Amino acid sequence: MTAPSQVLKIRRPDDWHVHLRDGDMLKTVVPYTSEIYGRAIVMPNLASPITTVDAAIAYRQRILNAVPAGHDFTPLMTCYLTDSLDADELERGFHEGVFTAAKLYPANATTNSSHGVTSVDAIMPVLERMEKLGMPLLVHGEVTHADVDIFDREARFIDTVMEPLRQRLTTLKVVFEHITTKDAAQYVRDGNDYLAATITPQHLMFNRNDMLVGGIRPHLYCLPILKRNIHQQALRELVASGFTRAFLGTDSAPHSRHRKETSCGCAGCFNAPSALGSYAAVFEEMNALAHFEAFCSLNGPQFYGLPVNAGWVELVRDEQQIPGNIALADDSLVPFLAGETIRWSVKK
């Protein structure tokens, strides 16, 4: 029997879905991402969403100002799609290298999404322009109708929004973000080269029982919400198969402790401190470490048409305890897996 590996050396990874927030929160969380990842797709859902080139440039600079000396990190900015977005502004941002992609939030699907798209038809001219440009569309794939059960919103989105959209715009590059269901896993697997998916560590590690049995665990509450075990297993099998159109997207989404531990808590897991080690643990459990580097470091650049990162990262089998909280101005952040021990950690 071969002894388990003690070191994993991979090409420096990228995070293809992260929330860095703004202000004091941004200054606190950016270093956890910039230390490990060469690039990150930064979500545009600030309180005032990023809908113009100038706003994206200013936000990018605030991010870069928060990157510690010695970290080689490039934030990749995204445009928040709204019903009234100017297609010319989007094209200008793409050509000038400011916007890497555009994000479709169905209105009121998640944090700061009230400005989101009310219907795909409302933004069809923008999407047609994106198809011509080869600009990726990043999709939060849930319907938000009040009569649809929260656990069914992703599957319903595939049938009523995603598939009709892709039938209409056959060469539009689409990233189905943070997929959570066997329906989405199969849909992406069956798709063509214009369709890819990101998957979070929490959706690979946990299911809704982990969040709800024996007490509510608010720090596992995110959107899309954790699903049944059968869906978790489908996601694990997808990544373990070496499927090349699935890649790392943490959806790290920090909220202060008092906004999570409350009678109406916010959705999001702040997983940046432990995500890479968490992914490694899942791949090891699935006997799929041979596919770990591709998921973290190769598949995303291939889909986006970008070069892989030049540097390397080493993970070591060295148990580390995740801190119970992280200081944040006059509050604190509770990270994903707070107080728990993970068996893979990034070598400093």
Curated annotation (Swiss-Prot):
One of its GO terms (biological process) is 'de novo' pyrimidine nucleobase biosynthetic process. The modification N6-carboxylysine is found at K103. InterPro entries: Amidohydro-rel, DHOdimr, Dihydroorotase_CS, Metal_Hydrolase. Substrate binds at H19, L20, R21, N45, H140, L223, H255, A267. Zn(2+) 1 binds at H17, H19, K103, D251. The active site is at D251. The keyword Isomerase does not apply. Zn(2+) 2 binds at K103, H140, H178. One of its GO terms (molecular function) is zinc ion binding. One of its GO terms (cellular component) is cytosol. SUPFAM superfamilies: Metallo-dependent hydrolases. Pfam families: Amidohydro_1 (PF01979). It catalyses: (S)-dihydroorotate + H2O = N-carbamoyl-L-aspartate + H(+). Keywords: Hydrolase, Metal-binding, Pyrimidine biosynthesis, Zinc. Its EC number is 3.5.2.3. Binds 2 Zn(2+) ions per subunit. Its cofactor is Zn(2+). The keyword Iron-sulfur does not apply. Pathway: Pyrimidine metabolism; UMP biosynthesis via de novo pathway; (S)-dihydroorotate from bicarbonate: step 3/3. Catalyzes the reversible cyclization of carbamoyl aspartate to dihydroorotate. Homodimer. NCBIfam families: pyrC_dimer. Belongs to the metallo-dependent hydrolases superfamily. DHOase family. Class II DHOase subfamily. This is Dihydroorotase. It comes from Salmonella heidelberg (strain SL476).
